[in-house]
Amino acid sequence: MVSTNYAPEHAGIGPYATQIAEHWASTGHDAHVLAGMPHYPAWSVEPEYRGVLRRTEKRAGVTVHRRAHTVPPRQTALRRALFEGSILLHGAAAPPRMPKPDLVMAQMPSLAGGVTAARLAARWKVPFVPVVQDLMGAAAAQSGISGGDKAAAFAGRAEAYALKRATLVGVIHETFVDRVVAMGVDPAKIRLVPNWSHVAKPTKPRGETRHHLGWAPGQTVVLHSGNMGLKQGLEVLVGAARLDPEVRFVLMGDGSQRAALASMAADVPNLDIIPPAADNGFPDVLAAADVLAVTQHAAVLDMSVPSKLTSYFQAGRPVVASVAAQGGTAQEVRRSGAGVLVPPEDPEALLEAVRSLAGDPEGADALGAAGPVHVAAHLSREAGLARIDALVDEALGGNRP
């Protein structure tokens, strides 16, 4: 597998790549991953990997071949291009030393990872199967990144290069299909492989976790967990916090916009920005909140579906989604029955939804309870990995070793 993001990264694509590779290893396969240096979501290389050019390590039975790359602390089109370029160049200059594989899978993004995987598969003459987690061409156009128009054109060409060379293409949501087809991919080659909930169920009493976090028993707490990037449009939460000092808003995580958000919220005492929770405490923190928020800019339609949603649903708390009604994120919230939708970039509407849930505890609990039911029925780890297995088996023509 080629995946720039991999363990110990705990957010975004990394956990999915890790669980797939570890699943392969646990079932007796010799699993190798060409990965970057751990840097997400902080967009800062973790201390133990700083200054490391290349490293090969064994993690849970998986051989991980790491290659250094640039890590832009602030996202612009040029810096993103340098990031992708460094991944591509280092991957080409120092491909993993390993036996010929049966198949090459890529997690996309990164774009460079997809291109590298396509080239490795061609060199080894084995099937190539990319799994599209985000559409970077659409992301550049829709996220508001500086220089986005030129970046969108470049990213679209790189995506098309990789995807048109695939044996099969996995997409995590049906809203991606039309764009993938527009890149020249045969619709008959596209398979739906939704992500799954990769976190455990909460285990601690909510009151205990709230006390530990300093959240008062009667206070309404709205929590956003995950990446603080451009496409999230987290300014809407800062705006909502300004409107009602009695409601506590918590942004938990890291990302390229963290410093800007901290500056924007410097005079908002009821908004806290806290570091990511440890993996073993993460589910309990989500469950301790009254409302879980997912936000996106209004322009974000078909470029991504936040991986945080699967974790939110597992936590058993109601979701307020400030997203475009016609996008994939809204579809998933509707499908789950575990939340409510409000217009994107509208602090007043978001706050009104939060107040409505706070004023109807039974209704809020009913919405929240729908989340774990949806996970059990559709988003379990076992079901997700079975879909990946089926994708691999089909690409190998039923001749999986």
Give the residues covered by each predicted segment.
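N-terminal subdomain of nucleotide-sugar transferases
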Residues: 1-52, 56-57, 239-242, 400-401
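Conserved donor-binding/catalytic core segment of Leloir-type glycosyltransferases
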Residues: 216-232, 238-242, 250
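A short helix/loop element that forms part of the nucleotide-sugar donor recognition site in Leloir-type
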Residues: 49-54, 202-215
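Membrane-proximal helix-turn-helix segments that form the acceptor-binding/catalytic region
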Residues: 115, 119-123, 149-169
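Nucleotide-sugar-dependent
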Residues: 232, 276-287, 292-313, 319-331
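Nucleotide-activated donor-binding/catalytic signature segment of Leloir-type glycosyltransferases, i.e.
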Residues: 247-250, 259-283
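A short, well-ordered alpha-helix in the C-terminal region of glycosyltransferases
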Residues: 349, 356, 363-378
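Carbohydrate-associated surface elements
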Residues: 37, 175, 196
